[in-house]
Regions:
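Short hydrophobic/aromatic patch on the recognition helix
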Residues: 48-58
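Conserved NTP phosphate-binding and transfer environment spanning the P-loop NTPase/kinase superfamily
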Residues: 166, 172-173, 179-192
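Base-recognition residues in the alpha-helical recognition helix of bacterial helix-turn-helix
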Residues: 25, 56-59, 71
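Hydrophobic/aromatic residues within well-ordered alpha-helical segments
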Residues: 19, 72, 76, 90, ...
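Hydrophobic alpha-helical connector segments
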Residues: 67, 78-107, 122-125
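Amphipathic alpha-helical packing segments from all-alpha helical-bundle domains
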Residues: 74, 107, 114, 121-172, ...
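Amphipathic alpha-helical segments enriched in hydrophobic/aromatic and basic residues
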Residues: 31, 39-40, 50, 61, ...
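Basic, helix-initiating cap at the start of DNA-binding domains
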Residues: 1-46, 63-66
Length: 193
C-alpha cells in the first residue's frame, strides 16, 4: 500500500488563503447584520467552517475585527486611483469613492464601541483608517482641484470627518439619510464648469 502523496505546499497555502478570505467575507456580512459582537459560531456557519478554524486564523475577536476592517479599508483606498483612471472627471471619481466610503461607514454596527474599547488589539484601527483613507481622498481632491471642480482649500481629513459625522446612525436614521446628507455636502464642494 502506498503512502498518500502530501499536497504541495503551494496548494495548501492557496487553500488556507481561500479559507481565510471566506472567513473575512463571512465576518464582514455578519458584522453588517449583527455588529462586531456577533457570535463567532454565526461567522463560522456563514463561512462553512468550524469555530476552531476561525480561532486558528484569528485567535481573538480583535484580530478578526481588525482583519475585516483592514481588508475593507485597503479595498476602499485602492479604489481611488482606479476611479481616477476610469471616470469621466475627477469629481465623478470623488463622488463614487465617497459613496464607497459612506457604505463602509454606515455598515459598521458596533465599530464605534470597538474603537472606544480598552482592547489593545483594536487601539490602532482608527489610526489605520485615517492613515490609509485620508491620502486616498487627498489624491481625489487634488485631482478635482487641478481640474477646477472643487476649491483647492478643501482638506481630505476635514471632508472625511464631515462625512463620518453625517454617517452616525441612530434609531431614527436610515442609510439613505446618510447618503442624502453626504450628497448635499459634496454638491456644496462642487464647482461646476
Amino acid at each position: 500500500m502506498e503512502d498518500p502523496v502530501p499536497e504541495p505546499v503551494g496548494v495548501r497555502r492557496a487553500q488556507a488563503q481561500r479559507t481565510r478570505s471566506g472567513v473575512l467575507a463571512a465576518a464582514s456580512a455578519v458584522f453588517v447584520d449583527q455588529g462586531v459582537q456577533a457570535p463567532v459560531r454565526d461567522i463560522a456557519e456563514r463561512a462553512g467552517v468550524g469555530v476552531g478554524t476561525i480561532y486558528r486564523n484569528f485567535p481573538t475577536r480583535a484580530d478578526l475585527v481588525t482583519a475585516v476592517y483592514r481588508h475593507q479599508i485597503d479595498t476602499c483606498a485602492a479604489l481611488a486611483p482606479q476611479l481616477l483612471a476610469e471616470s469621466a472627471s475627477p469629481f465623478t471619481a470623488l463622488t463614487v469613492w465617497v459613496d464607497a466610503f459612506v457604505e463602509f461607514l454606515v455598515t459598521k454596527h458596533g465599530l464605534g464601541a470597538a474603537l472606544g474599547s480598552d482592547d489593545p488589539g483594536l487601539e490602532n484601527l482608527h489610526a489605520l483608517m485615517l492613515d490609509t483613507l485620508v491620502p486616498a481622498c487627498a489624491t481625489l481632491l487634488d485631482a478635482c482641484a487641478a481640474a477646477d471642480e472643487v476649491s483647492p482649500g478643501i482638506s481630505a481629513y476635514t471632508l472625511m470627518r464631515a462625512i463620518g459625522n453625517l454617517c452616525i446612525t441612530g434609531p431614527d436614521y436610515e442609510r439613505a439619510d446618510a447618503r442624502r446628507m453626504v450628497a448635499t455636502l459634496l454638491a456644496g464642494c462642487h464647482r461646476p464648469a
